[in-house]
Amino acid sequence: VFCSNPVEGYRHTTDKYSYDVLKKKVFDYKRGLQTFVKFDEVGDYFNLTGGEPTLHPDFLKILALIRTEFPQNLIRLLSNGRTMADPDFARRTCGIGGHPFEIAVPMFGGDARSHEAISRTPGSFAQTSEGLRNLQKHRKPGQIVEIRIIMTKVQARFLDGLVDYLLAEFPWVDRVVFLYEEIEGFAEMYKDRLLFTQSECSAHIDRNYDKLKKFKDVRMYHFSLCAVPTRLWPHVWNTLAGFKITWLEGCRTKCQYRDQCVGVHRSYVKHTGAPDIAPIETPRPVTFTGDPYHPILSSDGDAVRA
């Protein structure tokens, strides 16, 4: 919906993201105008993202506006969680968010040193952790709290300790999501430090397989099935917009799981050449859901570690 702290700074975007401008966009959207970008065919929902959306001086007013005008629609807040360290702010956010409402918060490490090596903000580990505790305390029935882990080469070094920390401190979270990094924007400047293959990435996740089974729901976004161990397939969700993906030679015609796979992110092909992407020509022991966004229900994959 808005970017409250873009690269050029907030003062240059008041004409785009002020409360009055956003209010007009919300009402225009309600009238049927395409004032917000829509990425897929799922029923309308609102992503509040940024930057850090909760830093917007009118964040709570904007949240209230959307909830009032669209009382039945999902609102998903993507936040670093630090503002939620203020218990009153967490309480008001959950109270205004209503239902359906989701909050997704990234965590980078299981202690201050590892977390802040990535966040680059002293004190952010304690703030984000406290924010999650406040969300647990103040969330309303049916509201979902999600922890996101952005998988890069740097993040992978801290993954084992992070999973241990999450199990110890936040076993109650509704969802843990692993996102394979999209190499775009600033990430392109540091791709040599961040980038590794999907196969290497999924191997780090698979190493924590037994621990991850203890969470309520574990998901993997932006992964091609051929780069993921079969036993992890039930956790793979297809969330990439169509304009972001492509298909390699043979994948459309030879792969047994073409209809269940998200495809390949164009940036992955651009920056790595997609060396681990290839059609799967032999069937695997899996059960389908019929849901294009969550295609695999179960797998007898412990015996098939592709």
Language-model-detected regions and their locations in the chain:
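A C-terminal junction/extension of Radical SAM enzymes
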Residues: 143-144, 156-161, 168-169, 174-260
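Residue-level preference for long, well-ordered alpha-helices that form the structural scaffold
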Residues: 15-18, 22, 121-124, 155, ...
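A short acidic, helix-capping loop that chelates divalent metal ions and anchors anionic groups
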Residues: 9-13, 111-119, 185-191
